[in-house]
Amino acid sequence: TDTEFEAAGGGVR
């Protein structure tokens, strides 16, 4: 899912 953590550039792709 999209979270602010992903927005910060730290998400599992």
UniProtKB/Swiss-Prot annotation:
Highest taxon of source: Eukaryota
Any single biological process term in GO: innate immune response
Protein name, entry field: Fibrinogen alpha chain
UniProt PTM: Conversion of fibrinogen to fibrin is triggered by thrombin, which cleaves fibrinopeptides A and B from alpha and beta chains, and thus exposes the N-terminal polymerization sites responsible for the formation of the soft clot. The soft clot is converted into the hard clot by factor XIIIA which catalyzes the epsilon-(gamma-glutamyl)lysine cross-linking between gamma chains (stronger) and between alpha chains (weaker) of different monomers. Forms F13A-mediated cross-links between a glutamine and the epsilon-amino group of a lysine residue, forming fibronectin-fibrinogen heteropolymers.
Role, per record: Cleaved by the protease thrombin to yield monomers which, together with fibrinogen beta (FGB) and fibrinogen gamma (FGG), polymerize to form an insoluble fibrin matrix. Fibrin has a major function in hemostasis as one of the primary components of blood clots. In addition, functions during the early stages of wound repair to stabilize the lesion and guide cell migration during re-epithelialization. Was originally thought to be essential for platelet aggregation, based on in vitro studies using anticoagulated blood.
Domain comment (free text): A long coiled coil structure formed by 3 polypeptide chains connects the central nodule to the C-terminal domains (distal nodules). The long C-terminal ends of the alpha chains fold back, contributing a fourth strand to the coiled coil structure.
Key words, A-Z: Adaptive immunity, Blood coagulation, Coiled coil, Disulfide bond, Hemostasis, Immunity, Innate immunity, Secreted
The species this protein was found in: Cavia porcellus (Guinea pig)
